[in-house]
């Protein structure tokens, strides 16, 4: 057993993580409770990380932390465990379950080890994953607005609700400016295509959406498109007033 342990360590030190992993898998159970057990268990977990088997790496680092919570390697293990789940996070358009798990693990690490040498990297990874989640939520909301051009009522209402939720959930998002513009766009399309009974209220809501955009982003890159939409809204408001006067 001692020879296998030494050879596994040699392979690990040489960067042959795949062969080292196979040996650690054989010997790890025999080292439970022994002085070398902590070292074996850490390198066993990290060998999975190094060969790109991040699911198992995350699990093994969790086992290590449960077995050796006071280890000198605890912070590194917690970071690498969180990073394992970070590596599993897919592109924004796919299911973000692994992204959610990675964010949870990263936040737990940051809270537990705020002064760790790995905290800066952990914060950067957390920001990246948060941006990915923001992008997914924003693209879904934007898709509603696009569909609202063809199916006015339901999709514009859904788009407005989704964009409101997005702005509330991610107030500091890099997509916030466009989200406010897209809300104005959806509100305008909904208002212009509304029944006479609901048109005035929705036209006013569209103007409010425009004002919110310009209040927060007076130099918005969407100014030209927003002003064109506002002209359409003002024209519809004038028509509404004329029709209302005729009806008196």
How would you describe each model-predicted region?
Residues 1-248:
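Acidic, polar-rich low-complexity tracts and alpha-helical solenoid repeat scaffolds
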């Amino acid at each position: 057993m001692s020879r296998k342990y030494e050879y596994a360590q040699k392979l690990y030190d040489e960067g042959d993580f795949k062969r080292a992993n196979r040996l650690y898998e054989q010997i790890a159970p025999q080292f439970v409770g022994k002085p070398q057990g902590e070292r074996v268990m850490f390198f066993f977990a990290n060998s999975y990380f190094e060969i790109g088997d991040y699911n198992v790496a995350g699990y093994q680092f969790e086992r290590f932390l449960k077995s050796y919570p006071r280890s000198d390697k605890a912070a590194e293990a917690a970071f690498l465990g969180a990073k394992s789940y970070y590596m599993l996070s897919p592109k924004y358009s796919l299911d973000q379950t692994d992204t959610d798990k990675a964010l949870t693990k990263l936040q737990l690490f940051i809270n537990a080890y705020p002064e760790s040498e790995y905290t800066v990297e952990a914060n950067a990874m957390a920001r990246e994953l948060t941006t990915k989640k923001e992008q997914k939520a924003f693209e879904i909301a934007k898709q509603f607005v696009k569909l609202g051009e063809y199916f006015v009522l339901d999709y514009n209402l859904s788009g407005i609700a989704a964009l409101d939720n997005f702005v509330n959930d991610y107030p500091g998002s890099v997509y916030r400016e466009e989200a406010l513009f897209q809300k104005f766009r959806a509100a305008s399309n909904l208002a212009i295509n509304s029944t006479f009974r609901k048109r005035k209220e929705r036209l006013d809501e569209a103007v409010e959406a425009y004002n919110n955009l310009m209040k927060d982003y007076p130099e918005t890159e969407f100014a030209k498109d927003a002003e064109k939409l506002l002209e359409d809204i003002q024209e519809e408001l004038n028509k509404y007033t004329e029709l209302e006067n005729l009806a008196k």
